[in-house]
Amino acid sequence: IERQGYAPVKDLLAYHLRPDFEAPPLMKTLISRHGARIRVRPLRKSALAQELEILRGIFNDAWSENWGFVPFTADEFARMGKDLSMLVREGMVQIAELDGEPVAFLVVLPNLNEVIGDLNGRLLPFGWAKLLWRLKVKFPRTMRVPLMGVRKKLQRTRIGPLLAFLVIDAGRQEVIPLGVQDVEMS
């Protein structure tokens, strides 16, 4: 590729974590200091359109200064939310509120690469049944966090990392009972 005149511009990172980790002492201290002001809750599917707009607002704000970021439009985010709703189990989208204002969120999805790897791109005649079984009954052992964000005004404060930790912690509490062993965050 480099012989064709292309050169690397930016290295992008992915993080892996085991969901059975213990909270670091610093997070425990921050929780004791600020926890009363923070509420973490799951996405309300009964108000999906409003909730998706909250997530979009947080995401666009949180990522606005990142390299290569292009903000989601309302239509794009609404469509993505509708498309992903069949993959999202209850509790897999967590929203953190600070003093009643939504300021952080996390979306955890099954790792579709694990789920569809042996289907060879074929849903017919029985691939669709295997896919459904693996998503609803025999849950995958790996998950992905494709979307996460903390509002920019909080990112360089002590509460910012706490908010990120709390939505991750709420998400991991949902995946541990499912037998998930690894979560990729990228």
State where each predicted segment sits:
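Conserved glycine-rich acetyl-CoA-binding loop
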Residues: 137-140, 151-165, 178
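Beta-sheet entry/capping signal
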Residues: 5, 12-14, 92-93, 102-105, ...
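Conserved acetyl-CoA-binding loop of GNAT-fold acetyltransferases
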Residues: 4-9, 108, 172-177
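Acyl-donor-binding surface of acyltransferase catalytic domains
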Residues: 1-39
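Conserved beta-strand-loop-alpha-helix junction that forms the acyl-donor binding cleft
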Residues: 2, 16-19, 150-155, 184-186
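A conserved beta-strand-loop-helix scaffold within acyl/acetyltransferase catalytic domains
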Residues: 42, 46-151
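Conserved GNAT acetyl-CoA-binding A-motif
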Residues: 141-144, 171-186
